[in-house]
């Protein structure tokens, strides 16, 4: 007779009891003492029936123990049942095909087949029938039932554990235990999915047999194993059906989406942003905690505004429950009054008011069913503070410089700067979850900045501000985000705290760099080549950096370690040449009256003068004539009555808000200075460099420069004029913080007179300027310091000055 059975349909390999020359026969005979006589196919079926009866009793007891556990798992199965329904239908088709193939083989056994070894019954199966077809039908029903209870496990990762469980279940009783365990060693992995499912069912039943319910420790292990069992579903599903890839990925996305929908903070890791081929952010991380007020700082042109726009446009993964607003565009110019433009920003309030009017009309027509809904509408209106909405809108507009008449003026009658104020008022009125302000003080006068500063200190929601006003950042912000080297770095505290920490960090980096250079010199002096010395130093640096990362719990950089470079400090230095001494009177207005045609006079009988050591800051609300006063002093406006007097040798350097108008846009900055002052090429470039204009911008047409770069060209021009008096009208617009610091230092070092109009509180205080306020058609000096003036401004608006402790 043949040494092996005839070819069967794909089934798990099994070891028969017949004669065989394979090495596994020795293993089987070693553990089976009952294989002394050979049994026919039908005799073995009878033995199987008896074994099935015994197993059935044991399984009934097991089923009672499993019933409680199955009830707990029922809810989980129900949720997964719908998702697996399609897979089960596909599996049923495969099972039917397998059954058809098995039935074709179920013919009366031939002489050779009678001597062929019969398959060993699978452990844990209930063979109720008295023949092979009954056993197969029973197996099929159990497979279908088990597949509904548990999705199939992947066969490959669990190969060893499944084979062990199957070998232990093949025959009951301790008699053949050793032989069964050794038989499993020679057993191949299942050849199809149904065999794998059978093996997993046997494994589950064996685990239930070994882990009794009273043993709580084993119960916990069982639950943990079942959780792992469920996590492995995805891998098997992906291997069997392409559509399962979509469902699994969708489930994962749904889980992430659910987390986002409940998030109150923003956490974005490893994002990159490029603009016009230039990388602005590379593997940067953004963390914004709800309720904190962040200041985003860094040099101009590095991507601060770009980041705000990406957040506002939701180009980054912002949680959908966080409403984001970036105040960047002026309000539409139309017939809408300013106060109504602010009120209409709250669309929820408008919808509730519209519904209230509709329900009131239904009640008047006798429809009593609207009463309940109307009461709920009233509750929502009360909760949103609808009754106080107009008062709130007018308070915000007043703080930003709108008097009662201006609040009712149509927006089309305002200039662009005032429409920007209306837009800012709308943003403050709406109170979004995350409010982003990009240079909010640029279009404001000093009084409006004082009010906004005070108002935002009480802001309870999340705030992200880009500003060049250090005093504003110091008062408002609780955290600073520093954009440096295409990454975002976080510092707790206001700008002053950040500045101290950053300077200390730079000092430490400089010490490390100097230590590294010293080590390189020592290695070279000891006979090492430059390449060897750098390699050895780099290895030592790598170890030290890794130690620092572990200490600070920082993520390890993906970049290859490099030698330290000298820390580059972004420094800007403004310098104005000192003027020669001039005898007084230097510059003054005497009995001046002035007003624009068709308007009320701004000044009447004004007397105002300066000396060479004067440091004066002109303050006052918008529209009172601050810029007009500067134009009268420079001689660009002629008084209606009175006169302007000045020293005949006096040279005035004037920086106007509309400085771009004095530049020739078709020229390069170098050409502009060369033509105006007959300077050599290199001298012109040196002058531009002293005011922080990058070297590559020296030869670009002025029309292609940014606002900040154009401002530096104007400052360079002022220095070339060698003025005796500097008259500056809002000089900090478009300058970054470092440049404003440099301007303040230059003013302090300058020996001539300075008159400035500025909304930057820090520039005013650090230059020790005397405050002169324009009011009631005159100019007068203020008694007290800048804090006294702030208090006076807020009290006039009915506000209370906030004094926040420094963090």
From Swiss-Prot:
One of its GO terms (biological process) is positive regulation of translation. Residues 1-227, 521-564 are annotated as: Disordered. ATP 2 binds at residues 620-627. SUPFAM superfamilies: P-loop containing nucleoside triphosphate hydrolases (SSF52540). Residues 47-65, 148-161, 208-227, 521-542 have a biased composition (Basic and acidic residues). Residues 197-207 have a biased composition (Acidic residues). Residues 266-510, 587-802 form the ABC transporter domain. One of its GO terms (molecular function) is translation activator activity. Coiled coil: none annotated. Belongs to the ABC transporter superfamily. ABCF family. EF3 subfamily. Required for efficient Cap- and IRES-mediated mRNA translation initiation. Not involved in the ribosome biogenesis. NCBIfam families: ribo_prot_ABC_F. This is ATP-binding cassette sub-family F member 1. It comes from Sus scrofa (Pig). The gene is ABCF1.
């Amino acid at each position: 007779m043949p040494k092996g059975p005839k070819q069967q349909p794909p089934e798990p390999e099994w070891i028969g009891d017949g004669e065989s020359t394979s090495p596994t026969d020795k293993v089987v005979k070693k553990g089976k003492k009952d294989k002394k006589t050979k049994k026919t196919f039908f005799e073995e079926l009878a033995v199987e029936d008896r074994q099935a009866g015994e197993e059935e009793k044991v399984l009934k007891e097991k089923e009672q123990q499993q019933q409680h556990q199955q009830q707990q798992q029922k809810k989980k199965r129900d949720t997964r049942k719908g998702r697996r329904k399609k897979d089960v239908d596909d599996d049923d088709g495969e099972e039917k095909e397998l059954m058809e193939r098995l039935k074709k083989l179920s013919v009366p056994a031939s002489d050779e087949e009678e001597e062929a070894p019969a398959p060993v019954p699978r452990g844990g199966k209930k063979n109720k029938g008295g023949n092979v077809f009954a056993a197969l039908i029973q197996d099929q029903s159990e497979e279908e039932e088990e597949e509904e209870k548990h999705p199939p496990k992947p066969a490959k990762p669990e190969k060893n554990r499944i084979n062990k469980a199957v070998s232990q279940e093949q025959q009951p009783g301790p008699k053949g235990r050793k032989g069964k365990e050794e038989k499993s060693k020679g057993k191949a992995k299942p050849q199809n999915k149904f065999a794998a499912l059978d093996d997993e069912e046997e494994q589950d039943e064996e685990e239930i047999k070994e882990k009794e319910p009273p043993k709580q420790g084993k119960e916990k292990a069982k639950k943990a194993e079942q959780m792992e069992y469920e996590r492995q579903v995805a891998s098997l599903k992906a291997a069997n059906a392409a559509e399962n890839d979509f469902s699994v990925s969708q489930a994962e996305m749904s889980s992430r989406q659910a987390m986002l929908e409940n998030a109150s903070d923003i956490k974005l890791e490893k994002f990159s942003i490029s603009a016009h081929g230039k990388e602005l952010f590379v593997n940067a991380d953004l963390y914004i905690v709800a309720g904190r007020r962040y200041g985003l700082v860094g040099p101009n042109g590095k991507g601060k505004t770009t980041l705000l726009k990406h957040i506002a446009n939701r180009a980054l993964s912002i949680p959908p429950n966080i409403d984001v607003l970036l105040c960047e565009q002026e309000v539409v110019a139309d017939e809408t009054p300013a106060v109504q433009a602010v009120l209409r920003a709250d669309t929820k309030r408008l919808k509730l008011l519209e519904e209230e009017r509709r329900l009131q009309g239904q009640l008047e027509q006798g429809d009593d069913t609207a009463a309940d809904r109307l009461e709920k509408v009233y509750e929502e209106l009360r909760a949103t503070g609808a009754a106080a909405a107009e008062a709130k809108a007018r308070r915000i507009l007043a703080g930003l410089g709108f008097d009662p008449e201006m609040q009712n003026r149509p927006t089309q009658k305002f200039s662009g700067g005032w429409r920007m104020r209306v837009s800012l008022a709308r943003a403050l009125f709406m109170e979004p979850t995350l409010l982003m302000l990009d240079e909010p003080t640029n279009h404001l006068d000093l009084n409006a900045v004082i009010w906004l500063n005070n108002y935002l200190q009480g802001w309870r929601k999340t705030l992200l501000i880009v500003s060049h006003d250090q005093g504003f950042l110091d008062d408002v912000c609780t955290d600073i985000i520093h954009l440096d080297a295409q990454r975002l770095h976080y510092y707790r505290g206001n700008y002053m705290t950040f500045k101290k920490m950053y300077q200390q960090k730079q000092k430490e980096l400089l010490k490390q760099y100097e230590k590294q250079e010293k080590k390189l010199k020592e290695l070279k002096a000891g006979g090492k080549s430059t390449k060897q010395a750098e390699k050895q130093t780099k290895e030592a640096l790598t170890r030290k950096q890794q130690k620092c990362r572990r200490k600070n719990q920082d993520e390890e950089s993906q970049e290859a370690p490099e030698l330290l470079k000298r820390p580059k400090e972004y420094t800007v230095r403004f310098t104005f040449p000192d003027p020669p001494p001039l005898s007084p009177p230097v510059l003054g207005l005497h009995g001046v009256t002035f007003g624009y045609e068709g308007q009320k006079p701004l000044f009447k009988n004004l007397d105002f003068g300066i000396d060479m050591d004067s440091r004066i800051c002109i303050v006052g609300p918008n529209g009172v004539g601050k810029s007009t006063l500067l134009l009268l002093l420079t001689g660009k406006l002629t008084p209606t009555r009175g006169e302007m007097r000045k020293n005949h040798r006096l040279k005035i350097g004037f920086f106007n808000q509309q400085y771009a108008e004095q530049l020739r846009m078709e020229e390069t900055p170098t050409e502009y200075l060369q033509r105006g002052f007959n300077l050599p090429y290199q001298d012109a470039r040196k002058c531009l460099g002293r005011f922080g204009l990058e070297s590559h911008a020296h030869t670009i047409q002025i029309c292609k420069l940014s606002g900040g770069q154009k401002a530096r060209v104007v400052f360079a021009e002022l220095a070339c004029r060698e003025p005796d008096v500097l008259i500056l009208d809002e000089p900090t617009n478009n300058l970054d913080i470092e440049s404003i610091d440099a301007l303040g230092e230059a003013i302090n070092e300058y020996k001539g007179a300075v008159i400035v109009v500025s909304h930057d509180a820090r520039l005013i205080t650090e230059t020790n300027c005397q405050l002169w306020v324009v009011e009631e058609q005159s100019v007068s000096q203020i008694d007290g310091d800048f804090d006294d003036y702030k208090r006076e401004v807020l009290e006039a608006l009915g506000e209370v000055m906030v004094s926040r402790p420094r963090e």
